[in-house]
Amino acid sequence: MPHHYVLTLFGLLPVATNISTWWNFGSMLLTCLALQVLTGFFLAVHYTANINLAFSSIVHITRDVPYGWMMQNLHAIGASMFFICIYIHIARGLYYGSYLNKETWMSGITLLITLMATAFFGYVLPWGQMSFWAATVITNLLTAVPYLGTSLTTWLWGGFAINDPTLTRFFALHFILPFAIISLSSLHVILLHEEGSSNPLGTNPDIDKIPFHPYHSHKDLLLLTLMMMFLFIIVSFFPDIFNDPDNFSKANPLVTPQHIKPEWYFLFAYGILRSIPNKLGGALALVMSIMILFCTPFTHTAHLRPMTFRPLSQLMFWTLVSTFITITWAATKPVEPPFITISQVTSILYFTFFLSIPILGWVENKIMNAP
């Protein structure tokens, strides 16, 4: 009976009793995705992918379309909420050793890359001043690729500069990629339930499991309610908190903003890019800041799965968190001392965490095995 399978999938799913609130972010991400697809559809109905009309169509949505302002703000701030949740979700995975479930981790990082691409394309669509220049700077990094760089950039732009074909294809990609995210999310969940969730102790929870519903579903519902409350408070009272003032002006290719920067959720990677005074080196560091997450399942040497009982790894983990926040902050500042030095030091610390995982695991094993 189909009813029985639905119950098995969502209700009778066996879950460890001791998983904490940090395991709630998966369901929150699913809610964010549903919200983004829904609001995105209503925005796409009224949006015009043309460089002369794009900015005006956004103004039309916010002013003339009934509840258009709410859809636009929910979509923009919902993206920020999406990234807050995904960064916490990844941090939890790093702390509790969830990356040892290799297939789930790999599909998750692929999801992150797809999400970042989707968000980047979406940031270009309003065709504001910062949208245009952020697109110019980031896509121009392709020219750093030896031999193929210039051809790749021209192919992506659809011409010799960012123009109407660029906006059209970015809109098409921004519309289609969320469906790839939905497919990858399904794969991610299937692979996760193949092995089952980890837990704060890192032990095998098979002897002590409870049904997902009603126990964990109610716990998920609490945090979902809090997240939606927080989202609607920002949308209602602080709708421009994440916006760049430059983006309220229509794109002008003849006027360069004083300080070009992407959305806040890309600033850590952008800060790493800016800290290297070489185009190719910076582009490689930018790519590696995400790709290095693929390495974590293969560099784990500790006998214990989570960092719960590993003080040295904990110290490095919280250094990574503070480093991430510091790079993000430094990337909002102009390229001048002391911000250049701060970006360079924090970039080194960021990569040091991933390089130190195997060494720290080995040291902690020695300490625990000591008589």
Curated annotation (Swiss-Prot):
GO terms, molecular function: metal ion binding; ubiquinol-cytochrome-c reductase activity
Q: Where in the cell is it found?
A: Mitochondrion inner membrane
> Binding positions for a ubiquinone?
193
Which residues hold heme b b566?
89, 188
- One short Pfam name that applies is Cytochrom_B_C
Q: Please state the span of the N-terminal signal peptide per the UniProt entry.
A: none
Instruction: Look up the record and name the cofactor or cofactors this protein needs.
Output: heme b
Domain of life, source organism: Eukaryota
Keyword Ligase found: no
What transmembrane ranges does the database entry give? 25-45, 69-90, 105-125, 170-190, 218-238, 280-300, 312-332, 339-358
Database matches in SUPFAM superfamilies: a domain/subunit of cytochrome bc1 complex (Ubiquinol-cytochrome c reductase), Transmembrane di-heme cytochromes
* Biological process (GO), any one: mitochondrial electron transport, ubiquinol to cytochrome c
Q: What keywords does the record list, in alphabetical order?
A: Electron transport, Heme, Iron, Membrane, Metal-binding, Mitochondrion, Mitochondrion inner membrane, Respiratory chain, Transmembrane, Transmembrane helix, Transport, Ubiquinone
Annotated residues for binding of heme b b562: 75, 174
Which GO cellular component terms are attached?
mitochondrial inner membrane; respiratory chain complex III
Q: How does it sit in the membrane?
A: Multi-pass membrane protein
> Could you tell me which InterPro entries the record lists for this protein?
Cyt_b/b6_C, Cyt_b/b6_C_sf, Cyt_b/b6_N, Cytb/b6-like_sf, Cytochrome_b, Cytochrome_b_C_euk/bac, Cytochrome_b_N_euk/bac, Di-haem_cyt_TM
**According to the record, how does the cofactor bind?**
Binds 2 heme b groups non-covalently.
Q: Which residue windows are coiled coil?
A: none
* Similarity-based family: Belongs to the cytochrome b family.
Extra info from the record? Answer: Heme 1 (or BL or b562) is low-potential and absorbs at about 562 nm, and heme 2 (or BH or b566) is high-potential and absorbs at about 566 nm.
Q: What does this chain do?
A: Component of the ubiquinol-cytochrome c reductase complex (complex III or cytochrome b-c1 complex) that is part of the mitochondrial respiratory chain. The b-c1 complex mediates electron transfer from ubiquinol to cytochrome c. Contributes to the generation of a proton gradient across the mitochondrial membrane that is then used for ATP synthesis.
- Subunit organization: The cytochrome bc1 complex contains 3 respiratory subunits (MT-CYB, CYC1 and UQCRFS1), 2 core proteins (UQCRC1 and UQCRC2) and probably 6 low-molecular weight proteins.
This protein's name? Cytochrome b
- This protein's gene is called MT-CYB
